[in-house]
């Protein structure tokens, strides 16, 4: 009889755990994996980025700089925001502003549902030749209001079309043109192209940095990036 008394509570405990697991999973956003997002991306030969093909590449710095830093990032990624604050800004000062290197920014929106409009916004901003201003404004907004304190809002729908349009206006863009660009998904194929490139480059997480064709594995300090760039410049 003692066994029966032991088994019954265990069965009840099992049901309770199953119930709370189900409820917990229902509270979580339905997150697609990076691999899923990469595979779902479709490129189109009729991409409407702009008639100026040079604007299809999102560049920070002098396009003719000797060294190219490819940065794959998601504006909703906490580590991308941390990289921007702790490494990216210093790289800009020491290498980008001095025209020694340039950053080619590639979107990889997979964290949350609002990652995608934020990514497409980079190309909308680039239409107005204000990609860098938009890029910096969105990262600063996320860091100052959220990720500087904690990462708990990672999956919340923060970067709505309305919020992105507001930030674009603060960055000096024409809000009406920007909003229309986002609303019509004008640059969907441009972001899909970024995702396809990320798959080809073996990107499995963000941020993912490539310096002159060589991937930098794992999170690194600023001094590590500085050393790698100095070697590339020799």
Q: What residue ranges belong to the model's regions?
A:
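Extracytoplasmic thiol/disulfide redox context detector
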Residues: 1-110, 180, 187-200, 230-234
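Cysteine-centric redox/oxidoreductase cores and disulfide-bonded domains
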Residues: 109-206, 210-234
């Amino acid at each position: 009889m003692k066994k029966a008394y032991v088994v019954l509570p265990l069965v009840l405990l099992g049901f309770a755990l199953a119930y709370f697991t189900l409820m917990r999973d229902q509270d979580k956003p339905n997150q697609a994996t990076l691999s899923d997002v990469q595979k779902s991306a479709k490129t189109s030969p009729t991409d409407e980025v702009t008639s100026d093909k040079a604007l299809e590449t999102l560049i920070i710095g002098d396009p003719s700089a000797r060294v190219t830093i490819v940065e794959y990032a998601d504006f909703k990624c906490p580590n991308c925001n941390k990289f921007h604050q702790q490494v990216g800004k210093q790289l800009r000062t020491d290498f980008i502003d001095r025209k020694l290197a340039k950053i080619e920014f590639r979107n990889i929106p997979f964290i949350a549902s609002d990652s995608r409009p934020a990514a497409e916004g980079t190309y909308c901003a680039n239409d107005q030749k204000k990609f860098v201003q938009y890029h910096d404004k969105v990262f600063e907004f996320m860091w100052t209001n959220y990720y500087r304190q904690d990462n708990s809002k990672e999956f919340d729908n923060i970067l709505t079309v309305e919020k992105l349009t507001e930030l674009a206006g603060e960055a000096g863009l024409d809000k009406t043109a920007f909003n229309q660009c986002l609303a019509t998904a004008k640059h969907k194929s441009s972001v899909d192209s970024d995702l396809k490139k990320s798959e080809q480059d073996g990107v499995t997480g963000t941020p993912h940095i490539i310096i002159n064709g060589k991937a930098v594995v794992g999170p690194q300090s600023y001094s590590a990036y500085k050393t790698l760039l100095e070697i590339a410049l020799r």
